[in-house]
Every structure is written in structure tokens, then in C-alpha cells.
Amino acid sequence: MVTSLFKSLGPVRGVNFHQTQPMFVSGGDDHLIKVWNYKAKKCMFTLQGHLDYVRTVEFHWELPWIVSCSDDQTVRIWNW
């Protein structure tokens, strides 16, 4: 293991690494989406809005968007 980062209030269900930045996004059972800087080893910001488990998170390959899918039956596009 290289490092470990903890801030989730439940299991993490989805993780996606940014293609060019030292970042990844995570989503899970706490209904939150967190954007992490893995070089700084800290959570940069948290996105709130889903009403149930976040199952999938992904950075858009070109635009400053994060797409998330939740058990609340919504797909959300976040402008970060």
C-alpha cells in the first residue's frame, strides 16, 4: 500500500482518477462525493446532493465535470 486516506462515513463504492491532475474522486454510502488530491493527501472538496448511496463517479475526460450515479435513481453532472 502506498498510502491510505480516510474521510468517508461508510463504504466507498466508486473511485476514478483524473487523467492529468493528481486527483481522484470517490463516492459511497454516505451519499457524498469527495475530490481528493493524492499528492497533498487531503480532501479538496465535498459535493452533496444525492439522497442515497453513490455507486459510480467519474471525471469527464475533457470538461471540468464529474458525473455521478446514485441509488436515488439520479445521474448528476457536477461542474467543478
Task: Give residue ranges: language-model regions.
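Short hydrophobic/aromatic-rich motifs at helix boundaries and adjacent loops
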Residues: 4-5, 16, 36, 78
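Short loop/turn segments that connect beta-strands within beta-propeller blades
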Residues: 38-41, 80
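Short C-terminal beta-strands that terminate individual repeats in beta-propeller domains
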Residues: 2-7, 14, 27, 43-49, ...
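Short coil/turn segments within WD40 beta-propeller repeats
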Residues: 10-13, 22, 30-34, 42, ...
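Structural WD40 beta-propeller signal
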Residues: 18-20, 60-62
